[in-house]
């Protein structure tokens, strides 16, 4: 997995982008035309980053987590202060490189790929070094032109 680091935006500074959050939920469509006002505002930095000093971004590479909603090229929001729990998607260090996998603590510690490809196998390293917990996955639905 190749890694690209991105500087986290400071939610309290000029990097903060507040956008309208509509109260209506949409069923695979747009907000109702009758909803002409936003009930509140949403700052994506505040929503995605609860601990700025412990949060960083990585770009996912590969297909080993495609059935867990992590696609090749997705932006991962990672919190180093979050305590890893069984079933969390984590960034772990294996042989000096980062990998994104599901953490299994039972019956024995393991890093599990969640893929539709049988080529990826569950890893059972002697020592698992967890670098952080993936708290959000940002996925583009349209290619940049």
Swiss-Prot record:
The keyword S-adenosyl-L-methionine does not apply. The active site is at residues 64, 101. The record marks 28-29 as: Cleavage. Keywords: Autocatalytic cleavage, DNA damage, DNA repair, Hydrolase, Plasmid, Protease, Serine protease, SOS mutagenesis, SOS response. The keyword Nucleotide-binding does not apply. One of its GO terms (biological process) is regulation of DNA-templated transcription. Its EC number is 3.4.21.-. Transmembrane segments: none annotated. One of its GO terms (molecular function) is DNA binding. Pfam families: Peptidase_S24 (PF00717). Signal peptide: none annotated. Involved in UV protection and mutation. Belongs to the peptidase S24 family. This is Protein ImpA. It comes from Salmonella typhimurium.
């Amino acid at each position: 997995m190749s890694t690209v680091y991105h500087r986290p935006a400071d939610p309290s500074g000029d990097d903060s982008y507040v956008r309208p959050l509509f109260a209506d939920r949409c069923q695979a469509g747009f907000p109702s035309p009758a909803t002409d006002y936003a009930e509140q505002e949403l700052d994506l930095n505040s929503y995605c980053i609860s601990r700025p000093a412990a949060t960083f971004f990585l770009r996912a590479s590969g297909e080993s987590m495609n059935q867990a909603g992590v696609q090749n090229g997705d932006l991962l929001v990672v919190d180093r202060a979050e305590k890893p729990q069984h079933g969390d998607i984590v960034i772990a260090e294996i042989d000096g490189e980062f990998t994104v996998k599901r953490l299994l603590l039972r019956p024995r510690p393991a890093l599990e790929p969640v893929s539709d490809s049988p080529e990826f196998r569950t890893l059972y390293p002697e020592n698992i070094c967890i670098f952080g917990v993936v708290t959000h996955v940002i996925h583009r639905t349209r290619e940049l032109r």
